[in-house]
Amino acid sequence: MVDMSEIYKNKKKALVRGSGDLATGVGVALYRAGFQVIMTDIAVPLTVRREVAMSRAVYEGRAKVEGIEGILVRSYQEALAVLEENKIAVIVDPKAEICKEFHPDLLVDAILAKKNMGTRRTDAPYVIGLGPGFTAGKDVHAVIETMRGETLADIIYDGQPIPNTGVPGYVGGYALERLIRASGNGRMEPKAQIGDIVKKGQL
């Protein structure tokens, strides 16, 4: 495990909107680069790969991904205390109001809502958006391509990424077949754990 204490003597500040799996990848990378990281999310976050997402902290109070711990906080002062412990602060703050107190050097919108949920290029010295919904040079400084394929992770400094197709990327020859959609509203009780081997028709 890398000792971050020396890096943290000259730390910069990053605010990540969202705390799902992709947002967590961003947050972890920034943490390892020496940034203090605050992640914001909605009160009931939806996460595809929740075992590797800081969004679990919203439900459980804390989450750990690759040895890096995220702690749920309720205020900016609590967030500062968590940052002093060299951990990531996670806060329920859908509009990222904490940005006004935190004054981040970098803001990354990793909500993946397929549209801009209020992020502005003036929110921080450097503002980056993930996926469709952003225009580099207009509402953000840069956009990261999230569409699977040869352009994945391309950095766009002028213009937009590939539009949302509504169809997930192909994995093993399957796209829409990889999704299970609920037939109605309600609470889901899982019958298998993430990582379990399942068979077609099992559920």
Roles of regions detected by a PLM:
Residues 2-203:
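Well-ordered secondary-structure scaffolds
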